[in-house]
Amino acid sequence: MLHKKYRPNVAAIIMSPDYPNTCEIFIAERIDIEGAWQFPQGGIDEGETPLEALHRELLEEIGTNEIEILAQYPRWIAYDFPSNMEHKFYSFDGQKQRYFLVRLKHANNIDLNKHTPEFRAYQFIHLKDLLKKIVPFKRQVYRQVIAYFRREGYLGC
């Protein structure tokens, strides 16, 4: 059996500023793949902690890192890239991620064009509608992480 190589990565489950009064989660549509909705995520640079990477990636991808950290998933969680997906990380079989549950402080600070755009659109959707919108190969990971945050009492909806 071949040893798989995963790219270290962080991902953010971003609750709306109205959480816990409303249970809406930020998702964004990739600029390079129409219809591919996901959480903001990105690689961890050499010498960077996952928390530092989270703040940098949010600033780069959504134009703000003004968040309140609610919880962190306690382990790395991996997924494989689909075999039919053309991805830019050819030396990796997939990504291993650290997930953070955060609450956005101000929705009006979102700016998808602040840096090199990675997303074409965003929306806040109810948690119950999340898995219908997300690309299929990430659904199992999202299910697992959300179940953990609910079970541990960090996500109350």
From Swiss-Prot:
It comes from Helicobacter pylori (strain Shi470). Its EC number is 3.6.1.-. Keywords: Hydrolase. GO terms for cellular component: cytoplasm. The lineage of its organism: Bacteria, Pseudomonadati, Campylobacterota, Epsilonproteobacteria, Campylobacterales. Residues 5-147 form the Nudix hydrolase domain. InterPro entries: Nudix_hydrolase, NUDIX_hydrolase-like_dom_sf, NUDIX_hydrolase_CS, NUDIX_hydrolase_dom, RppH. This is RNA pyrophosphohydrolase. GO terms for biological process: mRNA catabolic process. It is an enzyme of class 3 (hydrolase). The gene is rppH.
